[in-house]
Amino acid sequence: MAMSSYMVNSYVDPKFPPCEEYLQSSYLGEQGAEYYGASQGSDFQHQGLYPRSNYSEQPFWLAGAQGSAVQPRGHGQEQSAPPSHFPGQAEHCPPPPCPIPSCGQQPALKAPHGSAVKQPAVVYPWMKKVHVNSVNPNYSGGEPKRSRTAYTRQQVLELEKEFHFNRYLTRRRRIEIAHTLCLSERQIKIWFQNRRMKWKKDHKLPNTKGRSSSSASNPHLQTVPKDHQTDLTTL
């Protein structure tokens, strides 16, 4: 018990040397006695086994007033407001600028609602010749076939009269008939070609194109009658 009471008394009332000794020393100023005297009177009032800290707490409003009154010295620049810790008061930072595309790249066009603009597909000439009649019967294609000319009865009658007198037409006569019957020169030419083929078939005449090709392939057919004729004259 005696030892514990001694320790408690030493903690509660610490003993310091007299102030005169500190005043005589060279490393302490004149404020030593006042400092230690005030500390003994106010700070060292303990309630328990352990000493109380010397930290003096200040009220929140007083600390805020002192913090607002003190301003750092600057070169005429106003101090910016402290950042707010609330998300509602924070200012929205501007978004970074979009990168500029290079010359070889084209930016993709977008609609106002965010959907990409659909560009028309490129159709090449060789793509138009695809047979799509089975898929879409209304599609005529890029190069539709020429429709057959439907001759009227009056036109056919006039062409038959001309064919009866002349099976082959000259260029001038063909142009005259085309202007008279309101037809093209090509239509007159095709009609006469078809009519001659029909006439040869009706009269069972050989085709002139086939005969000329066969004679060109066998040139000895023309020389044989000539040799035979010479032989007869010699006799």
Swiss-Prot record:
Q: Which PROSITE patterns match?
A: ANTENNAPEDIA (PS00032), HOMEOBOX_1 (PS00027), HOMEOBOX_2 (PS50071)
Q: What is the lineage of its organism?
A: Eukaryota, Metazoa, Chordata, Craniata, Vertebrata
Can you tell me which family this protein belongs to? Belongs to the Antp homeobox family. Deformed subfamily.
Q: Which Gene3D superfamilies match?
A: Homeodomain-like
Please give the residue ranges the record annotates as the region Disordered.
66-93, 202-235
GO CC terms of this entry = nucleoplasm
Q: Which UniProt keywords apply?
A: Developmental protein, DNA-binding, Homeobox, Nucleus, Transcription, Transcription regulation
Q: Write down the PANTHER family for this protein, in alphabetical order.
A: HOMEOBOX PROTEIN HOX-D4, HOMEOTIC PROTEIN DEFORMED
Main location class:
nucleus
Localization recorded for this chain is:
Nucleus
Residue window of motif Antp-type hexapeptide:
123-128
Any one GO MF annotation of this record: RNA polymerase II cis-regulatory region sequence-specific DNA binding
Compositional bias, Polar residues, is annotated for: 209-221
Annotated DNA-binding ranges come to 144-203
What residue spans carry the Basic and acidic residues bias annotation? 225-235
Q: Does the keyword Cell division apply?
A: no
Species the sequence originates in: Gallus gallus (Chicken)
Enumerate the Gene Ontology biological process terms.
anterior/posterior pattern specification; embryonic skeletal system morphogenesis; positive regulation of transcription by RNA polymerase II
The name on file for this protein is Homeobox protein Hox-D4
> What is the recorded function of this protein according to its Swiss-Prot or TrEMBL entry?
Sequence-specific transcription factor which is part of a developmental regulatory system that provides cells with specific positional identities on the anterior-posterior axis. Binds to sites in the 5'-flanking sequence of its coding region with various affinities. The consensus sequences of the high and low affinity binding sites are 5'-TAATGA[CG]-3' and 5'-CTAATTTT-3'.
